[in-house]
């Protein structure tokens, strides 16, 4: 319905069809997908990612939050994007002194399986990601990219925030402290 306002010149041509990817995600059965990332499939898990290529600002906030995140009762799976992976992995390694509740990967190829096992998602607010999250009823913290046409990711995020289905952090307000406070 909200899209009709964006295409107000021809509202009769707007037709709701759904998102085929969202339907695929909704049929995935919960599996022990987290074990592939050395995480406990029985613990609450937060997935953090900034899209397939990663997002520097989200990654920076994650690194800043690491000292706090490793002390939490929940676990974190962080997908950094290929460009940022080695830097962030080395930050985590500097803190290594035992088993962590944080796993860092460059990319998640089995996202439908992972979505079916996590408790909360922190991500950008692209249309396909939000379709997948809403299909599964996953709570989310959305950080819209400020670098997209017509600020559509903010509009996408606000549609869920207005329905009390997500929280929103604007990228300029994102810090490690803000991330941890929001997750807690």
Model-derived segments and spans:
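Short, structured coil segments at secondary-structure junctions
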Residues: 9-12, 72, 98, 136-137, ...
């Amino acid at each position: 319905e909200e899209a009709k306002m964006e295409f107000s010149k021809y509202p009769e041509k707007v037709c709701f069809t759904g998102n085929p990817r969202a339907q695929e995600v909704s049929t995935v059965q919960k599996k022990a997908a987290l074990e592939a990332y050395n995480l406990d499939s029985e613990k609450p898990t937060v997935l953090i990612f900034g899209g397939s290529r990663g997002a520097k600002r989200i990654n920076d906030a994650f690194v800043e939050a690491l000292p706090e995140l490793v002390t939490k009762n929940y676990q974190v799976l962080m997908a950094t994007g290929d460009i940022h992976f080695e830097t962030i992995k080395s930050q985590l390694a500097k803190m290594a002194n035992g088993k962590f509740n944080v796993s860092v990967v460059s990319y998640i190829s089995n996202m439908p399986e992972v979505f079916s096992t996590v408790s909360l998602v922190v991500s950008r607010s692209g249309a396909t990601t939000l379709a997948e999250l809403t299909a599964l009823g996953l709570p989310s913290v959305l950080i819209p990219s400020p670098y997209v046409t017509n600020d559509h990711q903010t509009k996408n995020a606000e549609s869920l925030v207005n329905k009390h289905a997500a929280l929103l952090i604007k990228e300029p307000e994102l810090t490690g402290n803000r991330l941890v406070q929001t997750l807690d």
